[in-house]
Amino acid sequence: MPTITSYFGFLLAVLTITSGLFISLRKLRLI
């Protein structure tokens, strides 16, 4: 169970970082 929780947390962190980078890239392109 702890392994699944840690994996889910890691996946969520990666998704957040990826979305943040994507948003920043879009903002740079808009500017």
From Swiss-Prot:
One of its GO terms (cellular component) is chloroplast thylakoid membrane. The keyword Lipid metabolism does not apply. One of its GO terms (molecular function) is electron transporter, transferring electrons within cytochrome b6/f complex of photosystem II activity. It is a single-pass membrane protein. It comes from the Eukaryota. It is found in: Plastid, Chloroplast thylakoid membrane. GO terms for biological process: photosynthesis. InterPro entries: Cyt_b6/f_cplx_su6 (IPR007802). The keyword Thylakoid applies. Pfam families: PetL (PF05115). Keywords: Chloroplast, Electron transport, Membrane, Photosynthesis, Plastid, Thylakoid, Transmembrane, Transmembrane helix, Transport. The chain crosses the membrane at residues 3-23. HAMAP family: Cytb6_f_PetL. Belongs to the PetL family. PANTHER family: CYTOCHROME B6-F COMPLEX SUBUNIT 6. Component of the cytochrome b6-f complex, which mediates electron transfer between photosystem II (PSII) and photosystem I (PSI), cyclic electron flow around PSI, and state transitions. PetL is important for photoautotrophic growth as well as for electron transfer efficiency and stability of the cytochrome b6-f complex. The 4 large subunits of the cytochrome b6-f complex are cytochrome b6, subunit IV (17 kDa polypeptide, PetD), cytochrome f and the Rieske protein, while the 4 small subunits are PetG, PetL, PetM and PetN. The complex functions as a dimer. This is Cytochrome b6-f complex subunit 6. The gene is petL.
